[in-house]
């Protein structure tokens, strides 16, 4: 299996809306041309109001999720306050850069809400971190997802509008990218809560998108 197949075979999305951020992924995991799993988890909660999406090697992604969760909790214990989204992306960036000689095969998004409001960062395998403006997509399905996101995104989306946009963009990627598929996982982060969209609500939003 090539590095490109390992690193990019998925679709993950981040959308900033008026009151928070949406992190969304599909659920297919591949090994070359084979579908290895139809229920892969690609969004992890690493702090109270911060999530991380993963594309790339499953083992690398899971280890990084564990490390980030521990480090973010330690930050809160030591400093008496929650880590910011920017600080968490810097923490992840530094860790990946220190291991660049034996890199983690991942492409990540870190998004959440802190005292400055909602934000999302993309982080590559070498530790390069970039704060994205409003929308971002990673993985092999990202070109198709970006086509929908850039066409339909507008400032100050409501939560419902942002969820529908994420689902629409993922469905576009899943139709054309063989490494993306099986289902959709949506996380909503606001200043009040980190929550996952239930299957029942996902079906309702999907019906609205396809109507």
Curated annotation (Swiss-Prot):
Keywords from UniProt, A to Z, are:
Autocatalytic cleavage, Cytoplasm, Hydrolase, Protease, Proteasome, Threonine protease, Zymogen
Where is it chiefly localized? Answer: cytoplasm
Its BP terms in the Gene Ontology are: proteasomal protein catabolic process
Q: Which reaction does it catalyse?
A: Cleavage of peptide bonds with very broad specificity
TM ranges: none
Record's superkingdom? Archaea
Q: Which SUPFAM superfamilies match?
A: N-terminal nucleophile aminohydrolases (Ntn hydrolases)
Activity control summary: The formation of the proteasomal ATPase PAN-20S proteasome complex, via the docking of the C-termini of PAN into the intersubunit pockets in the alpha-rings, triggers opening of the gate for substrate entry. Interconversion between the open-gate and close-gate conformations leads to a dynamic regulation of the 20S proteasome proteolysis activity.
Q: Which InterPro entries match?
A: Ntn_hydrolases_N, Pept_T1A_Psome_bsu_arc, Pept_T1A_subB, Proteasome_bsu_CS, Proteasome_sua/b, Proteasome_suB-type
Q: Which top EC class is given?
A: hydrolase
**Could you tell me what this protein does?**
Component of the proteasome core, a large protease complex with broad specificity involved in protein degradation.
How does the record describe its quaternary structure?
A: The 20S proteasome core is composed of 14 alpha and 14 beta subunits that assemble into four stacked heptameric rings, resulting in a barrel-shaped structure. The two inner rings, each composed of seven catalytic beta subunits, are sandwiched by two outer rings, each composed of seven alpha subunits. The catalytic chamber with the active sites is on the inside of the barrel. Has a gated structure, the ends of the cylinder being occluded by the N-termini of the alpha-subunits. Is capped at one or both ends by the proteasome regulatory ATPase, PAN.
Q: What is this protein called?
A: Proteasome subunit beta
Q: Which organism is it from?
A: Methanosphaerula palustris (strain ATCC BAA-1556 / DSM 19958 / E1-9c)
Q: Which gene encodes it?
A: psmB
């Amino acid at each position: 299996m090539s590095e490109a197949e390992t690193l990019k075979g998925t679709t993950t999305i981040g959308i900033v809306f008026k009151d928070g951020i949406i992190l969304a992924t599909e659920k297919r995991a591949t090994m070359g041309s084979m579908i290895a799993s139809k229920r892969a988890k690609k969004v992890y909660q690493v702090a109270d109001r911060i999530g991380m999406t993963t594309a790339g090697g499953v083992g690398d992604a899971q280890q990084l999720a564990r490390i980030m969760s521990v480090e973010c909790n330690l930050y809160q214990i030591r400093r008496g306050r929650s880590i910011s989204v920017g600080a968490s992306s810097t923490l992840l960036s530094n860790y990946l850069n220190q291991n660049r000689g034996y890199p983690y095969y991942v492409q990540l998004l870190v998004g959440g809400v802190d005292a400055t409001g909602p934000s999302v960062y993309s982080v590559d395998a070498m530790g390069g971190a970039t704060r994205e403006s409003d929308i971002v997509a990673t993985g092999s399905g990202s070109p198709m997802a970006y086509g929908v996101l850039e066409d339909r995104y507008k400032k100050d989306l409501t939560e419902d509008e942002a969820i529908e946009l994420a689902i629409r963009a993922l469905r576009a990627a899943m139709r054309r990218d063989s490494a993306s598929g099986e289902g959709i996982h949506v996380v909503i982060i606001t200043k009040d809560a980190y929550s996952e969209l239930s299957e029942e609500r996902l079906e309702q939003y999907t019906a609205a998108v396809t109507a």
